[in-house]
A protein has these predicted regions:
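Low-complexity or membrane-interfacial segments used for flexible interactions
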Residues: 2-90, 96-99, 106-114, 120-125, ...
Length: 225
């Protein structure tokens, strides 16, 4: 069970697809993947009371097979209630044995939101930083040395889409996905899809997996989708 005890080698996730028990470098499981689905798992207590509890997510591949799990960890109830989407956070992405894959850390800021994406050893993989613009939503993606390697652009007329750009060429997208009529009626659960080139390094794909969580907090949390 994620965030607890170890799992058997394979089991079925909530959609009846296989979840794999991985060995080797867990980030390597991103190598054969060109699309990720990140689904927020709302707790019934939150649905019934309207209070934010700690966010939990399931990360699956393009075939619906579970790869990882993610959860917001730490943080006080007061921060959640008063700062809401502005609060600092740490999100841990783990495998089915609770082994860390990446960690996303966001410090408190009113503006120019940013988050660090760290590997399992705590080494910086990259950083996502919101840039100042009057209209468009723009983020800079930098590598561990601070060099900008990508940008994220949110088109004005497509509020649920962020284009992954490199040298003015679109390389992929982060898209908020509609989570279904029944779920939307009772919660503001956010689901995302991420697409990128198949031949990217797993560490680069992991940076954009981490970027999803900052985008979710800044643009969609407490906004009802």
């Amino acid at each position: 069970v994620p965030f607890g005890h170890a799992s058997p080698p394979t089991f079925l996730n909530s959609r009846g697809h296989k979840t794999y028990h991985f060995e080797r470098n867990m980030m390597d499981r991103l190598a054969p993947v060109d699309r990720l689905v990140i689904e927020q798992r709302k707790e019934w207590g939150e649905i019934l009371t309207g209070f934010e509890t700690k966010n939990k997510y399931e990360v699956s591949d393009q075939e619906g097979n579970s790869l990882y799990y993610a959860a917001e960890v730490g943080g006080s109830l007061l921060l959640r209630l008063f700062l809401k989407a502005l609060r600092p956070f740490t999100v841990m992405v783990v495998d089915s044995d609770s082994q860390t894959i990446i960690e996303i850390r966001r410090r408190f800021r009113f503006y120019f939101h940013e988050a660090d994406i760290l590997d399992a050893d705590g080494q910086l993989l990259g950083k996502i930083t919101k840039r100042f613009t009057l209209v468009r939503r723009v983020y800079s993606i930098t590598d561990s040395s601070g060099e900008e390697i990508f940008q994220l652009f949110g088109p004005l007329l497509k509020p649920w889409t962020f284009q992954i750009m490199q040298d003015e060429m679109e390389q992929g997208r982060i898209t908020k996905k509609w989570s279904g009529l029944a779920k939307e009626a009772f919660s503001d659960a956010d689901n995302f899809g991420v697409t990128f080139p198949l031949d990217w390094e797993p560490s680069t794909k992991a940076i954009f997996l981490g970027a999803v969580f900052l985008i979710d907090f800044v643009h969609f949390e407490n906004k009802g989708g």
